[in-house]
UniProtKB/Swiss-Prot annotation:
Belongs to the TACO1 family. YeeN subfamily. This is Probable transcriptional regulatory protein EF_2866. It is found in: Cytoplasm. InterPro entries: Integrase-like_N, TACO1_YebC-like_2nd/3rd_dom, TACO1_YebC_N, Transcrip_reg_TACO1-like, Transcrip_reg_TACO1-like_dom3, Transcrip_reg_TACO1_YeeN, YebC-like. It comes from Enterococcus faecalis (strain ATCC 700802 / V583). PANTHER family: TRANSLATIONAL ACTIVATOR OF CYTOCHROME C OXIDASE 1. One of its GO terms (molecular function) is DNA binding. The lineage of its organism: Bacteria, Bacillati, Bacillota, Bacilli, Lactobacillales. Pfam families: TACO1_YebC_N, Transcrip_reg.
Amino acid sequence: MGRKWANIKEKKAAKDANNSRVYAKFGIEIYVAAKSGDPDPHANQKLRFVIERAKTYNVPKHIIDRAIEKAKGSADEQYSELRYEGFGPNGSMVIVDALTNNVNRTAADVRAAFGKNGGNMGVSGAVSYMFDNTGIIGFAGDDADEILEYLMEKDIDVRDVVEEDGQIIVYTEPEDFHHAQEALKEKGIEEFTVTELEMVPQNEVTLEGDDLGNFEKMLDVLEDLEDVQKVHHNVDLPE
């Protein structure tokens, strides 16, 4: 699964290069998580893990605090979690996760991003069966075997643990993602480089020429949409 981690790193690097957009998206995600339950992260697991993920993107504390304070107030913006599936050039597959307060706007924007760049939006389930929902947790370390043994002792369903470039990368079943992160904290691991629930493709495709150019443009347009939180795909992008 090493290549999957490489793809995560590439996506994180691209997002880190556009901080204002990342901060705005996390602000909404934190607001929604805080509004859906207790605004105290210690009493709201969903909020706690969104904050943990935000920290891996270096989202400043004041952005996090402002979103939580907004949730405590009288504002009551209604957001919907949506997933769109579609096809890019030459058989590439794309899943788009969105968080929106205007479903019609988001659907139109996502459809246009596909259609104008050699792709087309499909129905629910059109491509998701070719992806595996996977928890991915990364942190500094070099003993993958020790971490695997520790997590197995905690009865956590682990798909794989690898060491790569001074990082331990843990791949879990989605239902054990949060349990694994809590167990690692109990072990004294306080700083994570990645905490993601990713739709990992079962197989990747390689694009070339115009197909690659159109796909990368489509990806940029989708990720620039304010309502889009994540874009998953099965393309092995060149480094």
